[in-house]
From Swiss-Prot:
Keyword Protein biosynthesis: no
Stated consequence of mutating residue 855 to D: Defective in MMR, but not in NHTR
This protein's name: DNA mismatch repair protein MSH2
CDD domains reported in the protein's UniProt record: ABC_MSH2_euk (cd03285)
Consequence of substituting residue 402 to F: Partially defective in a mismatch repair assay
Annotated positions binding ATP: 688-695
Keyword hit for Transcription: no
Consequence of substituting residue 640 to L: Defective in a mismatch repair assay
Effect of substituting residue 524 to Y: Partially defective in a mismatch repair assay
GO BP terms: DNA recombination; interstrand cross-link repair; meiotic gene conversion; meiotic mismatch repair; mismatch repair; mitotic recombination; removal of nonhomologous ends; replication fork arrest
UniProt GO molecular function: ATP binding; ATP hydrolysis activity; ATP-dependent DNA damage sensor activity; double-strand/single-strand DNA junction binding; four-way junction DNA binding; mismatched DNA binding
Interaction with MSH6, as annotated region: 851-964
C-alpha cells in the first residue's frame, strides 16, 4: 500500500504555510470524526487523524511524514505534526472502515479547507461513489423525539426513519417503559445505523432520561448524533414531505401521525438536506413498520446467537456485501455466524433481504408456513433450484444500485445492464412454467409458487417489452456485443451518423497502418504487434521490450513511452489520424450525451417495475439459499412442526444441533434433545462443567427457534416449535468494562430489560447470571430472578448456572426442570506420555443435577500432581458432608429455632458424658483399650436415645431417628 502512496505537493512555500494555517483555524473536531483534504488525484489526512489512518489502514506508522510548519503556525498547531496521503483506491477502504465498521463520521474539504462533503454511518450518499462497493444491508437513519410521562414512568417516542438507498421514509410512535425495550427492538429490527436525538443538556431531569435512551442506542451499535431541540419542530414538515413523496398524501399525515413523529421527521429531513438536491424530490415512498409483526430481539440476542460476523470494533457485523461464492464463510473461509451459514445468495438484493429477515423473524404462523412450503418445494425440485442458482440468479444485477446511479451520473452501460436484466425475466418465467406444467396443477404448493413468484414476474413481462423495444431502437447492441462499446445507433440521429461514418473511415486507416507496420517490422499483427487505444496517447502500437530493438532500425517510428508491458510507439501519419479520431470522438460523445440522458430518463420511469421484480427475485434467492443450506448440511435439516402463540406451548427437539458449530472442522459435536412444555417443564436449569457445553445447549435452542421463524428448516431429526414473540438473552458482559460499566451493572440493566420485555410467549436465555458480584449476592440475585421468571412470567426459559443450589427451585415450582451436562472423557491409553490431544470432551445434556466432581476427574486425567488431587478430593468430601447435613435438615423441615434449642440439649448431654469419663480416668488414650472406648461411646448414644422428649421436640426426634 505504501509503495503507491502519492506525495503531498505545494506550488510554493507560501501555499504550504497557508494550507496549515487554515487547518488550525477550523472549528473543534467532533469525537469519532475523520477529516480529509481532497488534493485532486489523492487525499491528505493531518494530525491525530493521520496516525489513526496509519494504524488502521496501513498498519504501520512508517507512512507518516512531518508537516513543514513555520514558527507562528506551529504554536497554534495542537495536533501531532504528521500527515499521510491516501490514494483513491485506499480512500474506498478508509471510508468503508470509518463509516460502516467503526461508526465514525467523515468530513472532506477542498484545498482551501472548505467543507465539500460529509458523511455519517446513516448518511453515506455524498461519498457513495467514492466507496465503490456494495452494501449488504439498507443504510437506515432514524430520529427520535421523546415525551416522558412523570406519573407512570412510561414515555412516548416519536420515531421517523429514512432509507436513502431505497428512497423510503416512515414514522411511528413507540410507547415504552423505563428501560426502553421497545426502542431497542425497533433499532434491531431495522438495523438502524445512526440516531438523531435531542440535546437536552440544559434540562438536568430530561437529560438524565435521555442519557438512558442514548445508552440503549449505543448498545444496539448505532451512532448517536445530538441536534438542537428546535430542529425537532413539526412546523411545515407536511410541505417538505409533499415534495419528497411527490403527491398530496403528506397533507393528511398530521391526522395519521403524532406531532412527536412529525417533529422527528422534520429533524431528519433537515439533517440529510434531502430537499437541497433535485433528484430526491418525488422519489420517496411512505412505508409502515409494525413492531408486533416480528419477533423481538435485544442487542444481547444478536450477539449471543451469532447472527452476524463479529469483529473487535463491530459486534453487530460488517455491512460489506458478501455474495455467495466469495464469502459464505467470509474472507477467512470459516463459518462463524448464522448469516454466513445461510448466505448462499447469488444476488446483492438477496443478501440484503437475508440480512433483513434475520433481524425480523416472523410471528404469524401462516406466513412462516408459506416460507417453509417454498423451501420444501425447492428442496424437492433439485433441477429447478440448480438452474436458478447457477444460470439465472447470478446474472441479476443490483437494480437498486443501478437506478440510483442512473439518477445521478448514469450512462449507456448502466442502461444495458438493466436491459439484460429485463430480458432474463421471460426466461425465468418460462423455466417456472415448464416445471409447474409437469406437476399436478392443483397441488397447494404449486399455487403458492404461482402467486409468490410466477405471477409477479409474468405480470411485468408485457410492460418491459416496451422498454426493451426502446433500447433496441436507440442503442447499437452490435457495437456492444462485438467491441464492448456503448453507442447510440447512427440511424437514430442524422448528425451522429455523419460523425460515425468519419470515425469508421479513420479507424479503417488506423487498422491499415497497423498491418503495414507489422509487415515492415516483421511481426505477427495478431500476436506480436498490438494495436491499442491508450488513455494518454490515443491509438498507437505496442511491442514487448525484447522485440522493441527492431524499432531502432526504422526512423519513421516514434517511441511514446516505456512501461513493464512494453514500448508504445507510433508514426507521424498514425499520430495525425489518432488526434483527428480523438477530436471526432469527443464531438460524437457530446452529440450523443443529450440522447443518452433522454434514454436514461425514459429508463428511470420503469424504476418501480424494476424494483418490484428485484424484490421478487431477492425473495426467490433467499428461499433457494435456505433450500441449499438445508440440503447440504452435514446432516440435512428438517421442516419443523409449528405451534402458534396462545395455543399449545410446546417445543420438542430431537437430536438438535448448533448449525454453526457443527460446521467447524475441529469440533466433534453431539446432538441433544430439548423439551420445553408450558406448566410441565418450561423453565430448564442447566448445570455442569464450565467448559462450553451449557452455553452451546441454551444458545442452540434460540438459534433453532429463530431459524424456524425466518422460514428456514432446522438442524434436528424431529422438531416441534412453539412460536415465540421475543428471544431475550443475558449471556455475558462483552466489552462493557471498556465503557466504564461494571459487569454487575450490565447484568442488572440487561436483566431488568428482559423482565420488562418478556411475555408468556417469549424465550429467555440466561448464561451464568450473578458472576459479576460476590457469591452470596450472585446466588441471591440468580434465585430471585429465576423464581420470578418461572412463577410470574411463565415463558420458556433456559438458565445455565454454576450455582448448583439453584436446582432446589425445582422442589418449589413444578414447571422447573433440572438438566445437566454429562462430560464424557476419552483418553488415548496407548500413549504413555500425556498429550493435550489425548482428551476429547463430548457433551450430552440429560435430566438431573450435575456431578460436581467433574473438575477433579479432569485433573486426574491430565496428570495433575497426586498430592493436589488428594487434597481436592478431601476438601470436596468435607463440603459434600456439610451440604448433605444441610439438605437433611431441610428435608426434616426443622426451623432454625428448633435446631438451636436441640443443640443446647445435646451439648448438655455431651458435657455430662465427658465429666463421667474424666472421673473414671478414661480420658487418657494410653489408659483405655479400644474395646472400653467403644463401650463408652455406646453409653453416650444410649443416653441420647433415652433422653425424654418435650412437646414438639422435632430436633431430638430427628437425631434419634438417625441413631436407629
Amino acid at each position: 500500500m505504501s509503495s503507491t502512496r502519492p506525495e503531498l505537493k505545494f506550488s510554493d512555500v507560501s501555499e504550504e504555510r497557508n494550507f496549515y494555517k487554515k487547518y488550525t483555524g477550523l472549528p473543534k473536531k467532533p469525537l469519532k470524526t475523520i477529516r480529509l483534504v481532497d488534493k485532486g488525484d489523492y487525499y491528505t489526512v493531518i494530525g491525530s487523524d493521520a496516525i489513526f489512518v496509519a494504524d488502521s489502514v496501513y498498519h504501520t506508522q512508517s507512512v507518516l511524514k512531518n508537516c513543514q510548519l513555520d514558527p507562528v503556525t506551529a504554536k497554534n498547531f495542537h495536533e501531532p505534526t504528521k500527515y499521510v496521503t491516501v490514494s483513491l483506491q485506499v480512500l474506498a477502504t478508509l471510508l468503508k472502515l470509518c463509516l460502516l465498521d467503526l461508526g465514525y463520521k467523515v468530513e472532506i474539504y477542498d484545498k482551501g479547507w472548505k467543507l465539500i462533503k460529509s458523511a455519517s454511518p446513516g448518511n453515506i450518499e455524498q461519498v457513495n461513489e467514492l466507496m465503490n462497493m456494495n452494501i449488504d444491508s439498507s443504510i437506515i437513519i432514524a430520529s427520535l423525539k421523546v415525551q416522558w410521562n412523570s406519573q407512570d414512568g412510561n414515555c412516548i417516542i416519536g420515531v421517523a426513519f429514512i432509507d436513502t438507498t431505497a428512497y423510503k421514509v416512515g414514522m411511528l410512535d413507540i410507547v415504552d417503559n423505563e428501560v426502553y425495550s421497545n426502542l431497542e427492538s425497533f433499532l434491531i429490527q431495522l438495523g438502524v445505523k445512526e440516531c438523531l436525538v435531542q440535546d437536552l443538556t440544559s434540562n438536568s431531569n430530561s437529560n438524565a432520561e435521555m442519557q438512558k435512551v442514548i445508552n440503549v442506542i449505543d448498545r444496539c451499535g448505532c451512532v448517536v448524533t445530538l441536534l438542537k431541540n428546535s430542529e425537532f419542530s413539526e412546523k411545515d414538515v407536511e410541505l417538505d414531505l409533499t415534495k419528497l413523496l411527490g403527491d398530496d398524501l403528506a397533507l393528511s399525515l398530521p391526522q395519521k401521525y403524532s406531532k412527536l413523529s412529525m417533529g422527528a421527521c422534520n429533524a431528519l429531513i433537515g439533517y440529510l438536506q434531502l430537499l437541497s438536491e433535485q433528484d430526491q424530490v418525488g422519489k420517496y415512498e411512505l412505508v409502515e413498520h409494525k413492531l408486533k409483526e416480528f419477533m423481538k430481539l435485544d442487542a444481547s440476542a444478536i450477539k449471543a446467537l451469532n447472527l452476524f460476523p463479529q469483529g473487535p470494533q463491530n459486534p453487530f457485523g460488517s455491512n460489506n456485501l458478501a455474495v455467495s461464492g466469495f464469502t459464505s464463510a467470509g474472507n477467512s473461509g470459516k463459518v462463524t455466524s448464522l448469516f454466513q451459514l445461510l448466505n448462499h445468495c447469488k444476488t446483492n438484493a438477496g443478501v440484503r433481504l437475508l440480512n433483513e429477515w434475520l433481524k425480523q423473524p416472523l410471528t404469524n404462523i401462516d406466513e412462516i408456513n408459506k416460507r417453509h412450503d417454498l423451501v420444501d418445494y425447492l428442496i424437492d425440485q433439485i433441477e429447478l433450484r440448480q438452474m436458478l442458482t447457477s444460470e439465472y440468479l447470478p446474472m441479476i444485477p443490483d437494480i437498486r444500485r443501478l437506478t440510483k446511479k442512473l439518477n445521478k451520473r448514469g450512462n449507456l452501460e448502466d442502461v444495458l445492464k438493466i436491459y439484460q436484466f429485463s430480458k432474463r425475466i421471460p426466461e425465468i418465467v418460462q423455466v417456472f412454467t415448464s416445471f409447474l406444467e409437469d406437476d399436478s396443477p392443483t397441488e397447494p404448493v404449486n399455487e403458492l409458487v404461482r402467486s409468490v413468484w410466477l405471477a409477479p414476474l409474468s405480470h411485468h413481462v408485457e410492460p418491459l417489452s416496451k422498454f426493451e423495444e426502446m433500447v433496441e431502437t436507440t442503442v447499437d447492441l452490435d457495437a456492444y456485443e462485438e467491441n464492448n462499446e456503448f453507442m447510440i445507433k447512427v440511424e437514430f440521429n442524422e448528425e451522429l451518423g455523419k460523425i460515425r461514418s468519419k470515425l469508421d473511415t479513420l479507424r479503417d486507416e488506423i487498422h491499415s497502418i497497423h498491418l503495414d507496420s507489422a509487415e515492415d517490422l516483421g511481426f505477427d499483427p495478431d500476436k506480436k504487434l498490438k494495436l491499442e487505444n491508450h488513455h494518454l496517447h490515443g491509438w498507437c502500437m505496442r511491442l514487448t521490450r525484447n522485440d522493441a530493438k527492431e524499432l531502432r532500425k526504422h526512423k519513421k517510428y516514434i517511441e511514446l513511452s516505456t512501461v513493464k508491458a512494453g514500448i508504445f510507439f507510433s508514426t507521424k501519419q498514425l499520430k495525425s489520424i489518432a488526434n483527428e479520431t480523438n477530436i471526432l470522438q469527443k464531438e460524437y460523445d457530446k452529440q450523443q450525451s443529450a440522447l443518452v440522458r433522454e434514454i436514461i430518463n425514459i429508463t428511470l420511469t420503469y424504476t418501480p417495475v424494476f424494483e418490484k421484480l428485484s424484490l421478487v427475485l431477492a425473495h426467490l434467492d433467499v428461499i433457494a439459499s435456505f433450500a441449499h443450506t438445508s440440503s447440504y448440511a452435514p446432516i440435512p435439516y428438517i421442516r419443523p412442526k409449528l405451534h402458534p402463540m396462545d395455543s399449545e406451548r410446546r417445543t420438542h427437539l430431537i437430536s438438535s444441533r448448533h448449525p454453526v458449530l457443527e460446521m467447524q472442522d475441529d469440533i466433534s459435536f453431539i446432538s441433544n434433545d430439548v423439551t420445553l412444555e408450558s406448566g410441565k417443564g418450561d423453565f430448564l436449569i442447566i448445570t455442569g462443567p464450565n467448559m462450553g457445553g451449557k452455553s452451546t445447549y441454551i444458545r442452540q435452542v434460540g438459534v433453532i427457534s429463530l431459524m424456524a421463524q425466518i422460514g428456514c428448516f432446522v438442524p434436528c431429526e424431529e422438531a416441534e416449535i412453539a412460536i415465540v414473540d421475543a428471544i431475550l438473552c443475558r449471556v455475558g458482559a462483552g466489552d462493557s468494562q471498556l465503557k466504564g460499566v461494571s459487569t454487575f451493572m450490565v447484568e442488572i440493566l440487561e436483566t431488568a430489560s428482559i423482565l420488562k420485555n418478556a411475555s408468556k410467549n417469549s424465550l429467555i436465555i440466561v448464561d451464568e447470571l450473578g458472576r459479576g458480584t460476590s457469591t452470596y449476592d450472585g446466588f441471591g440475585l440468580a434465585w430471585a430472578i429465576a423464581e420470578h421468571i418461572a412463577s410470574k412470567i411463565g415463558c420458556f426459559a433456559l438458565f445455565a448456572t454454576h450455582f448448583h443450589e439453584l436446582t432446589e427451585l425445582s422442589e418449589k415450582l413444578p414447571n422447573v426442570k433440572n438438566m445437566h451436562v454429562v462430560a464424557h472423557i476419552e483418553k488415548n491409553l496407548k500413549e504413555q506420555k500425556h498429550d493435550d490431544e489425548d482428551i476429547t470432551l463430548l457433551y450430552k445434556v440429560e435430566p438431573g443435577i450435575s456431578d460436581q466432581s467433574f473438575g477433579i476427574h479432569v485433573a486426574e486425567v491430565v496428570q495433575f500432581p497426586e498430592k493436589i488431587v488428594k487434597m481436592a478430593k478431601r476438601k470436596a468430601n468435607e463440603l459434600d458432608d456439610l451440604k448433605t447435613n444441610n439438605e437433611d435438615l431441610k428435608k426434616a423441615k426443622l426451623s432454625l429455632q428448633e435446631v438451636n434449642e436441640g443443640n443446647i440439649r445435646l451439648k448438655a448431654l455431651l458435657k455430662e458424658w465427658i465429666r463421667k469419663v474424666k472421673e473414671e480416668g478414661l480420658h487418657d488414650p494410653s489408659k483405655i483399650t479400644e474395646e472400653a472406648s467403644q463401650h463408652k461411646i455406646q453409653e453416650l448414644l444410649r443416653a441420647i436415645a433415652n433422653e425424654p422428649e418435650k412437646e414438639n421436640d422435632n430436633y431430638l426426634k430427628y437425631i434419634k431417628a438417625l441413631l436407629l
